[in-house]
Amino acid sequence: MWNDEDNNPYGAFDSEARLSESLHSTTIESPFNHDYPPPPSSHSSNPDISDFSQHPEASDDDEGDYVGQANRAGYSHKSVYDSRIEQLLYENPDMPILITDAGKNHEGGGSFIVYTIRTGDLEVRRRYSEFASLRQTLVSLHPTLIVPPIPEKHSMADYAAKPTKAKEDAGIIDLRKRMLAVFLNRCRRMKEIREDGVWWRFLDPNVSWSEVLHSHPASSVPKNNLKAPPLDPANPTPAHAWLPVPSASAKLKSTSGTSSSPNAEAPGPEILGRFPPESRKLSEKDLDPYFINFEASTRELELLLQGNMEKVNRRTLAHLSGLSADLMELGARYNGFSLSEQSPTVATAIERVGQAADTSYIETEELSLALGANFAEPMRESAQFASVVRSVLRYRVLKRVQEDMTRDELSKKKSLLESLERSEQEAKRIEQYLNRTSPQAPTKQRSLSTSSATSSQGGTDESRPSGEETASIDSDFPPTHAEHVSQRYPESGQTSPPAHRKTSSGTFVANKIFGRISHAVHGFVDVDPERTRRDHIGKTKESLVQLEQALGVSEKDVKDASAGVLQDLKRFQKDKEADLRRYMVAYARCHLNWARKNLETWTEAKDEVDKIEAR
């Protein structure tokens, strides 16, 4: 029914197209049939009701055969196993992972809820926070995979309603038991997660989960997974350390320009949500619109599931719960009324109607529970999946932005290096010119010194400008230079000794003050621009080498990220189609069972009413 909905990010395609669209030759596995618990009450099919109740069962059997074949095909037996739990998982691919119990743990001085996980004959107890850390670790190790979600944490409304009992709410604990089991079984079907050495250790009772988190590969992933390769984040190369990190809200550059592939066409509205064709090799720029459209459609689906669908489901379940309570009260009233009736046939008929109301109450309550477990909860999980898909697509976008940033930074460094090299060449030309003209400089200096010496012998009136000249020199040079300049004029100091003492003390204070200023100025004034320029050129060349290596790994990362995301999106596509079909079948079966049981009991009540004898 979804084939015509192009805007649906999980839109189905033709069967042949779906089977041939795998980006890499991997086995696509379908969901287990035991992901969600069966309805609380299961009744045998009645062939007289409708053919619809028979076909889903037959098709489910076929699907079960396919599931078993797919699961067995996805497992490769090993000759040596690292632990008993790994052997169980590989040798029994159809064995479910169950959460059998949830209760308080009083060991270690704390009181918290732990969940008992059973895999075959092995059991391990884990907290909710450990499940959360497992999922976060899997997301870090596999950023291109759509890692299944786990139930959400307690909301602030829960804590406000039950400040001390929020974590012990039986309904929330039962929900977590079901959904955490679904999470573990979904992870088991993903080959990359199953073989990464982290997930199965979570199920091993002989392994400390804290030690797993602080050992390779979990501890080897960089804090920012953008500085690691997409397919192997636990083993980054040195070049990944030089990659720039874009902001979380960064966007791709406009893709409205000329396409890099001459035969590629930008996808129009008619193929929104579709995967790129395999017949053409598209560049990353040509792939961008497909991912962008898929992300936008996924966001729309998330809003739909979290908005209108969630409201309708909650309202329906509340209505069924209220109806069951009314039927319970109605049955009690009819039963009480039958006791006061004098006519035996009427009393029996009324009692039978009351029993039918009681049966309807029980069946309606079971219908409410079954719809909540088999339809409402999976729909909430689908909304969480939509958020996970958007985060994976966002990772690929950030990798593309990172590549563009690296390329831009490399271009800037090249321009800077060219500018520095031009400046270096200009400085060398100026130096060569000065070297050619430098032999004439000593003659001028000697003539100047001779004329200054002649003028210094002129008299007291002519010596006064020399003193002013000395003062100007003192103010322009550091104290060491000022002392050498003052030594050239000993005559003025000999003519007036008192003035000399006063001037020398003043000069000492001035030299001390100006010396500090000169030292401070030398701290931020380039005293050796030539050496600084050469150092800058060397550092720029080193940065160029690093950025060239970073650009190389960034281009490879983008290709790997696109391939990995596309591959897992196609796997996820098939799983979602099977999940959606299972949800709809479960929804119909719940109502069929409810209607069948009510039809039987009310038919019996009608027969009793027909037996009433009129007086």
UniProtKB/Swiss-Prot annotation:
- Residue sites binding a 1,2-diacyl-sn-glycero-3-phospho-(1D-myo-inositol-3-phosphate) per the record: 127, 129, 153, 176
Q: Name one GO biological process term.
A: protein transport
Q: What is a single Pfam family found in this protein's UniProt entry?
A: PX
Record domain PX: where: 93-210
Indicate, by first and last residue, each region the UniProt record lists as having compositional bias (Polar residues): 252-263, 434-446
* Compositional bias ranges of the Low complexity kind: 42-53, 447-456
Transmembrane regions: none
Q: Mind naming one GO cellular-component term on file for this protein?
A: endosome membrane
Q: Where in the cell is it found?
A: Endosome membrane; Endomembrane system
User: Would you indicate the residue range of the signal peptide?
Assistant: none
Q: Which UniProt keywords apply?
A: Autophagy, Endosome, Lipid-binding, Membrane, Protein transport, Transport
> What GO molecular function annotation could you give as one example from this UniProt entry?
phosphatidylinositol-3-phosphate binding
Note down the stretches annotated as region Disordered: 1-71, 218-277, 432-504
Q: What is the membrane topology noted in the UniProt record heading this document? A: Peripheral membrane protein
InterPro entries attached to this UniProt entry: AH/BAR_dom_sf (IPR027267), PX_dom (IPR001683), PX_dom_sf (IPR036871), PX_Snx41/Atg20 (IPR044106), Sorting_Nexin_Autophagy (IPR051079)
Name the principal localization, coarsely classed.
Answer: membrane
Q: Does the keyword Transferase apply?
A: no
Q: Which family does it belong to?
A: Belongs to the sorting nexin family.
Explain the purpose of this protein.
Answer: May be required for cytoplasm to vacuole transport (Cvt) and pexophagy.
Q: What is known of its domains?
A: The PX domain binds phosphatidylinositol 3-phosphate which is necessary for peripheral membrane localization to the perivacuolar punctate structures.
This chain belongs to the protein called Sorting nexin-41
The upper taxonomy is: Eukaryota, Fungi, Dikarya, Ascomycota, Pezizomycotina
